[in-house]
Amino acid sequence: MAVIDQHQDDFSNVSWNTDEHTAAESSSSVTATEFDDTERNGHNAYESDAPGSDGQEVLDCVVSEPLKENDGSKDTFVSYLITTNTTFPSFQRSQTTVRRRFTDFVFLYKALSRDYPTAAVPPLPDKQRMEYVSGNRFGPDFTNRRAHSLQRFLNRLSLHPVLRRADILHIFLESPDWNATMRSRSVRGSTSSDTGSSGVFDNLTDSFLNAFTKAHKHDKRFLEVRERSDKLDEDLAHIEKVVARVARRENDIELDFKDLAEQFQKLITLEPGVENEVRHFANSIEDTAMGLRKLKDVTDGDYLGSLRDMQAYSTALKSLLKAREQKQVDYEQLTEYLNKNTVDRDQLQSGQGSSGLSGASGRLMRKLEDVRGVDHEQARRDRQRKLEMNIDKLTTEAERAKKTSEMFDDEVVKEVADFERIKRVEFKKQLGGLADSQIEFYDEVTEIWEGYVKAMEKEGVSGTRSTGVEPPGRRLAD
């Protein structure tokens, strides 16, 4: 059943971070009403979302420069440069730079998930979700996409009021001897796993049984969160398809422009009389193709990846909601079992046979006791004493489960508010970056072709075939 030993409960030793969470982030509300008010603030809420805007410590991380290391050996891997600017007093310097590989990020994620079970820890990019990338896992397409995803992972951690203060995160961002930290924590983790191994089977049994049990009373707040998360996933999936189609078309147009420029270059040998005009025209087309390449890299490599990463983050929130529901199911199952034992005890006290059972089952039990020569009164007292012991134990367990469930509810409400705030900041940043790339592309294309027109007009005014007026193309190549 759902009777859970105190030492086997994964959340029995959890620090619920009530004071720390509230002090760390005032925008994290504890009620759905306050959270809705935060959402309705609209654009004004963005100002308070920025790190350090409310006077708290700044933690700004930048992931860049993927580097292939140990090339040519079986231990080849890619490391990423992490540059951190912070005002946290726990850091030795305000700016630090370290290199970390993907397995280091995995270790950090697992450590945070273990240390903060009541938090929706942002997920890492899944290795199996990179099949759409051309080339191998050491190619620039793959490593640049992963760098963008790792950047979003650290951004989410830096915006979370509790996770941003985690010691393991600070060590990850600064320590020059990270491998030693991983080894020491792995040893401690394996030791604690051995200590608690006796309860593994019981926990698995409880989880398996409760997996088929649903909560009887549903909290409207979390039902609404689940519905909104499902709607978010649906919308993101639609947007992802459209953006992927846009990226493919940008790539096709880029290839068409390159082919067009190549064909005009071939035309020069056939029409030497317009060599200068054709060369400038071909160069302008080629520069436009380079601009499309940059635009496609932002659309496909960064923005499209952000949509997939947000879907994964939404899934992490749903997992937390499921864990919250599991805590509620545990409490309801314990309460149901307690009520059953209470009814059995009351039936015994009312004198409904030594078994405490009524109906056909009670009569059958009494006949069996008669055949065995059991003293009915002694059997009744023994069963009543056993039921009293069970009731006392179940009462304690039910009260503890209720407290755990209520605390978990409060933490999940805070996590939902944090998720919405982080999502809002990320959407604003990603959409802003996409808009900036579009503006930059069209500004540069306008400059390229205006330069070409001016160059051609100047040639027409001079009446000679100038060879020195180069339109401001080629700038995109730089």
Curated annotation (Swiss-Prot):
Residues 1-10 have a biased composition (Basic and acidic residues). PROSITE patterns: PX. One of its GO terms (cellular component) is mitochondrion. Residues 24-33 have a biased composition (Low complexity). Disruption phenotype: Abrogates mitophagy. Decreases formation of secondary hyphae. Decreases colony growth and reduces conidial production. Decreases virulence on A.thaliana. Residues 58-180 form the PX domain. A 1,2-diacyl-sn-glycero-3-phospho-(1D-myo-inositol-3-phosphate) binds at residues 101, 103, 127, 146. Keywords: Autophagy, Cytoplasm, Endosome, Lipid droplet, Lipid-binding, Membrane, Mitochondrion, Transport. Induction: Induced during nitrogen starvation (at protein level). It is a peripheral membrane protein. One of its GO terms (molecular function) is phosphatidylinositol binding. It is found in: Cytoplasm, Cytosol; Preautophagosomal structure membrane; Endosome membrane; Mitochondrion membrane. It comes from the Eukaryota. Transmembrane segments: none annotated. Residues 1-56, 459-478 are annotated as: Disordered. It holds the Pfam family PX. GO terms for biological process: endocytic recycling; mitophagy; piecemeal microautophagy of the nucleus; protein transport; reticulophagy. Interacts with the mitochondrial prohibitin complex subunits PHB1 and PHB2; the interaction is direct and plays a role in mitophagy. The PX domain binds phosphatidylinositol 3-phosphate which is necessary for peripheral membrane localization to the perivacuolar punctate structures. Sorting nexin, involved in the separation or division of vacuoles throughout the entire life cycle of the cells. Involved in retrieval of late-Golgi SNAREs from post-Golgi endosomes to the trans-Golgi network, for cytoplasm to vacuole transport (Cvt), and autophagy of large cargos including mitophagy, pexophagy and glycophagy. Required for the switch to necrotrophic growth. Belongs to the sorting nexin family. This is Sorting nexin-4. It comes from Colletotrichum higginsianum (strain IMI 349063) (Crucifer anthracnose fungus).
